């Protein structure tokens, strides 16, 4: 079994992933931004769940907008467990509204959480993984960088940046025996606080200028609900199950990308072609080594 650090485990996909891995016997460092404050209830509930499972749970505070926080969380894993095998990048936040109405601070803040946050955690974890010449980075991304729905502009941009960072980082860390898997969930309107906890644009004056579109924005949740077969609803558990499945695969056999999309938007086909095109270009450049795991 592996020692796994997961970001953003208070709700949704992160919570389901922590529970699934605990049920399989892994040692899980379930991190939350404020485990002793606003996330204390979630931490307590996860602790109660873990009490009857074969895995070992450790709750840790981790704010992905702070390098010091990321460093401290990873160092705690090393100090207590002796090693770190897997990092699951899951922490993220949603903004809904008119793109023009998001200030530069709004956009910077979302990119900081959804993209730069994973980079901070990598900077904390990779020295240990490189030293062992093994490990796995799992990125919980989104199909949204392909489907690009309206009224979610900054979120789309942040998830595209997150995906790009995952790809370019994979080239380099593969040469130290570190695998990368990007799991791309489709929309999951229920079972998370993603939509209910979404932030809005700060510029009220610009937002008011788009008032004619307010009725469309109000349909965002309904529109996403309509994507799914009532018999096959989108569920955070389906994503958690895929992360868990990937971690059971032998070294060198983990998929670089896996799409988990109950909406069946065809993103798997798009990304398969995109990755083939990217890999072909990297080979044309003469850097084919970075596409292979160096053991």
Where are these regions (language model features)?
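A glycine-rich helix->loop->beta "capping" turn
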Residues: 54-56, 76-89, 95
């Amino acid at each position: 079994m592996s020692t796994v650090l997961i970001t953003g485990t208070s709700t949704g996909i992160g919570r389901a992933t922590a529970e699934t891995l605990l049920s399989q016997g892994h040692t899980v460092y379930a991190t939350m931004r404020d485990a002793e404050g606003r996330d204390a209830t979630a931490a307590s509930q996860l602790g109660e769940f873990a009490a009857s499972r074969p895995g070992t749970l450790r709750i840790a505070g981790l704010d992905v907008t702070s390098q010091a926080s990321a460093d401290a969380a990873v160092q705690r894993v090393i100090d207590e467990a002796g090693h770190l095998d897997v990092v699951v990048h899951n922490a993220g936040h949603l903004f809904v509204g008119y793109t023009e109405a998001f200030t530069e601070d709004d956009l910077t803040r979302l990119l900081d959480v959804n993209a730069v946050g994973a980079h901070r955690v990598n900077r904390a974890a990779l020295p240990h993984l490189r030293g062992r010449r093994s490990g796995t980075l799992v990125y919980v991304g989104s199909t949204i960088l392909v489907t690009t729905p309206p009224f979610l502009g900054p979120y789309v941009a942040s998830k595209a940046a997150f995906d790009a960072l995952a790809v370019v980082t994979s080239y380099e860390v593969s040469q130290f025996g570190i695998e990368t898997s990007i799991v791309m969930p489709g929309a999951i309107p229920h079972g998370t606080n993603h939509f209910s906890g979404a932030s809005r644009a700060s510029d009220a004056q610009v937002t008011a200028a788009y008032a004619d579109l307010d009725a469309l924005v109000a349909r965002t949740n309904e529109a996403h609900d309509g994507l799914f077969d009532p018999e096959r609803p989108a569920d955070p558990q389906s994503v958690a199950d895929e992360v868990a499945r990937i971690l059971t695969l032998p070294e060198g056999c983990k998929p670089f990308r896996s799409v988990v999309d109950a909406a069946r938007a065809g993103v798997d086909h798009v990304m398969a072609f995109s990755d083939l095109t990217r890999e072909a270009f990297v080979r044309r450049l003469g850097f084919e080594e970075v596409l292979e795991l160096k053991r």
